[in-house]
Curated annotation (Swiss-Prot):
GO terms for cellular component: nucleoplasm; nucleus; spliceosomal complex; U4/U6 x U5 tri-snRNP complex. A zinc finger (UBP-type) spans 103-200. Its main location: nucleus. This is Ubiquitin carboxyl-terminal hydrolase 39. The gene is USP39. SMART domains: ZnF_UBP. Its EC number is 3.4.19.12. It holds the Pfam family UCH. Belongs to the peptidase C19 family. GO terms for biological process: cell division; mRNA processing; mRNA splicing, via spliceosome; protein deubiquitination; RNA splicing; spliceosomal complex assembly. It is found in: Nucleus. Residues 225-555 form the USP domain. The modification Phosphoserine is found at residues 46, 82.
Length: 565
């Protein structure tokens, strides 16, 4: 072997030995570091620990000093703050950066109160979900949630709208930072969303004549507020306006505690009508509204649902039919029954009467046979006691002939002439498909608030016809004592009534519109409301209208007439 090859073999052998020695020393060093690592970790207080095969479970748990690092509450993981956790922080006196941000949010000046409208249904404008709905206080739109991937979070990042209000908890939040905003300057927004009234405020409603100023500068009287006509719901608007000015009914629904604990069967949707009506009453009488009108959207949606689409927003309806259904549905939803259990509805509007009925022989029969039939028990007069929510007043038939100017003659009739139906003497014939009856009526109990429904529409086989007869009625001092039976007249100390609401139907039966005249008790003035339009009106002008529904208030002993004419 040459000298050169010997040198190369010795060099390769030496290199192998050095690499092996370096590898073994590296392994030894790594093993030493691995043994030292748990000791160093425990000395630093790190949560990292080595899991050993024979270590007991209690020894493997994190030490007490590690707990704050292990249990970290992240805002994007939890949608709602924990109240107990907030209380603990307050007791310990630890105010973190989140609390400081809550008190000093830099985005409060971006809130635009002029676009806020809480009258519509509380659902997300994207997902159409009612769950966890938030209102953007910059643009007024509704969004769901406030988590990392929620519609409200995406909206805040995309459009730089940062202040949101939870429509259910009434809490304010800043997104996307996701912290609660606590500021007293936002109380006016929560009051518009959910107005509240104390007993003292409710008692003074009819004594105040002070105008309120909306956010846009317009002035209005609480309670005399226009209702938005979404499409063809003016018939419902007029009825709701009239009922909102009946003090006992209004006072009952202004205080939510009066009805929120009423128990209803599971799945009962009728109680939704009570809740929505209460919300509408509080909005109509809110002295701190942002605008001088209210939209009855949520109320009407409850009407459509509970009436099974008998009454709709997009189709004109009959005011009397709606009033009759609404009062009975409200009575039933409040837990009332037909005979025994009473509610605020029956306490305010329900009266009673006697109905005398006598069957008539068929008109085509011979006179002798008629005489014989009249002696049978079937043709004897019977009497039943019945309750009523309103009285239907029949108008005389309108003339068919025109005057010398080729115009239809519009007749006039006094109110007391059509009230004679209930004096217990006047008989009227009622026809059915096979039989004819004579009926007369006599009142036995007068309610605190009496509703008159003037029958203007008659249906035949082809169309609905409207009677344009003008009813001449006084605004005050209508005494109904003569329409009571003699034995109950002594029980009724007060039988004098004053008008407080007058609903008018204008135009054709299918294409007409509704408006209402309302008395404001605080000022003693009359106002005309037609959808969003509110104007004052002289009492003398009210009697010239085609009255359709009227609400009269029974006068008390200590009450004086303040209505003027």
């Amino acid at each position: 072997m040459s000298g050169r090859s010997k040198r190369e073999s010795r060099g390769s052998t030496r290199g192998k030995r050095e690499s092996e020695s370096r590898g073994s020393s590296g392994r030894v060093k790594r093993e030493r570091d691995r043994e030292r690592e748990p000791e160093a970790a425990s000395s630093r207080g790190s949560p990292v620990r080595v899991k050993r095969e024979f270590e007991p479970a209690s020894a493997r748990e994190a030490p007490a000093s590690v707990v704050p690092f292990v249990r970290v509450k992240r805002e994007r993981e939890v949608d709602e703050d924990s109240e107990p956790e907030r209380e603990v922080r307050a007791k310990n006196g630890r105010v973190d950066s989140e609390d400081r941000r809550s008190r000093h949010c830099p985005y409060l000046d971006t809130i635009n109160r002029s676009v806020l409208d809480f009258d519509f249904e509380k659902l997300c404008s994207i997902s159409l979900s009612h769950i966890n709905a938030y209102a953007c206080l910059v643009c007024g739109k509704y969004f769901q949630g406030r988590g990392l991937k929620s519609h409200a979070y995406i909206h805040s990042v995309q459009f730089s709208h940062h202040v949101f209000l939870n429509l259910h908890t009434l809490k304010f939040y800043c997104l996307p930072d996701n912290y609660e905003i606590i500021d007293s300057s936002l109380e006016d927004i929560t009051y518009v969303l959910k107005p509240t009234f104390t007993k003292q405020q409710i008692a003074n409603l009819d004594k105040q004549a002070k105008l309120s100023r909306a956010y846009d500068g317009t002035t209005y009287l609480p309670g005399i507020v226009g209702l938005n006509n979404i499409k063809a719901n003016d018939y419902a608007n007029a009825v709701l306006q009239a009922l909102s000015n009946v003090p006992p009914l209004r006072n009952y629904f202004l205080e939510e505690d009066n009805y929120k604990n009423i128990k209803r069967p599971p799945g009962d949707i009728m109680f939704l009508l009570v809740q929505r009506f209460g919300e509408l009453m509080r909005k109509l009488w809110n002295p701190r509204n942002f605008k001088a009108h209210v939209s009855p959207h949520e109320m009407l949606q409850a009407v459509v649902l509970c009436s099974k689409k008998t009454f709709q927003i997009t189709k004109q309806g009959d005011g009397v039919d709606f009033l009759s259904w609404f009062l009975n549905a409200l009575h039933s939803a409040l837990g009332g029954t037909k005979k025994k259990k009473k509610t605020i509805v029956t306490d305010v509007f329900q009266g009673s009467m006697r109905i005398f009925t006598k069957k008539l022989p068929h008109p085509d029969l011979p006179a002798e046979e008629k005489e014989q039939l009249l002696h049978n028990d079937e043709y004897q007069e019977t009497m039943v006691e019945s309750t009523f929510m309103y009285l239907t007043l029949d108008l005389p038939t309108a003339p068919l002939y025109k005057d010398e100017k080729e115009q239809l003659i519009i007749p006039q009739v006094p109110l007391f002439n059509i009230l004679a139906k209930f004096n217990g003497i006047t008989e009227k014939e009622y026809k059915t498909y096979k039989e004819n009856f004579l009926k007369r009526f006599q009142l036995t109990k007068l309610p605190p608030y009496l509703i008159f429904c003037i029958k203007r529409f008659t249906k035949n086989n082809f169309f609905v016809e409207k009677n344009p007869t003008i009813v001449n009625f006084p605004i005050t001092n209508v005494d109904l004592r003569e329409y009571l039976s003699e034995e109950v007249q002594a029980v009724h100390k007060n039988t004098t009534y004053d008008l407080i609401a007058n609903i008018v139907h204008d135009g054709k039966p299918s294409e007409g519109s509704y408006r209402i005249h309302v008395l404001h008790h605080g000022t003693g003035k009359w106002y005309e409301l037609q959808d969003l339009q509110v104007t004052d009106i002289l009492p003398q002008m009210i009697t010239l209208s085609e009255a359709y529904i009227q609400i009269w208030k029974r006068r008390d002993n200590d009450e004086t007439n303040q209505q003027g004419a």
